[in-house]
Amino acid sequence: MSQDQESPRCTHDQHLQTFSETQSLEVAQVSKALEKTLLSSSHPLVPGKLKEAPAAKAESPLEVPQSFCSSSIAVTTTSSSESDEASSNQEEEDSPSSSEDTSDPRNVPADALDQKVAFLVNFMLHKCQMKKPITKADMLKIIIKDDESHFSEILLRASEHLEMIFGLDVVEVDPTTHCYGLFIKLGLTYDGMLSGEKGVPKTGLLIIVLGVIFMKGNRATEEEVWEVLNLTGVYSGKKHFIFGEPRMLITKDFVKEKYLEYQQVANSDPARYEFLWGPRAKAETSKMKVLEFVAKVHGSYPHSFPSQYAEALKEEEERARARI
């Protein structure tokens, strides 16, 4: 295992980072993005009405993915201000009586949990950009605060958002200190960002396109790809909050990185174009991994798509024989 692939080691940073809830604009932007993108139950990677995606569960061990935060270290964060603590204490005094079971997420207003989830997504991406993984203590202190009993629910939902929208897995890299890191999904090693560029990973968009290509028979016309992306709020030529200008990203950046091939459809007049998996996508991930992602979006299982499952299984068997 290379040094870059080793799990980040949890240590303390003497320069404490403060992440204040005064960043309400960023939280609002994240909340808006979550509403408009992949978590919609109508996300149409394949035809037909879709079910809600199932709750995330531990996946069977695969190869260790390339970390988006390749040199992360842990950090202890401070609370935003004494006034926040006072506000929190006041909220506790104003909270429902102890006789009410507030540990059940169903007894908490949906908008309150949604705000915590959106804020946690924003917080985790911020820590990742700072090359610092996330500790449970950080999340409880800065994000969850008086909602500790709902920690598991909030973390689960934030993890699903990071997975489906940004193409990132939340991994507990140190069970002793409950230290977490964000890792690119499906074995991919490119986050869709140029070197030194500030922003968030664009891997989620790449995974969608790879999924559309596979589900359409290993080649998808440009019209088919944009039909899916349009329904997730991503439009050609229109800057997207997360993905920037998506057409440039898909037809130039992903092609340059050899994740996609973009070519003219044979004998088309007027010229039409199509997408195929590029050599880097074929080398780093597999049809089965992509199918598992598609199935999760649909709230089903890989074998629910018989032809694609048979094709993916055949590829797995061929790769296994090649390793012998």
Swiss-Prot record:
GO terms for biological process: negative regulation of transcription by RNA polymerase II. Residues 70-81 have a biased composition (Low complexity). Residues 1-15 have a biased composition (Basic and acidic residues). GO terms for cellular component: nucleus. PROSITE patterns: MAGE. InterPro entries: MAGE, MAGE_N, MAGE_WH1, MAGE_WH2, MHD_dom. Residues 82-95 have a biased composition (Acidic residues). Keywords: Tumor antigen. The keyword Nucleotide-binding does not apply. PANTHER family: MELANOMA-ASSOCIATED ANTIGEN B16, MELANOMA-ASSOCIATED ANTIGEN MAGE ANTIGEN. This is Melanoma-associated antigen B16. The lineage of its organism: Eukaryota, Metazoa, Chordata, Craniata, Vertebrata.
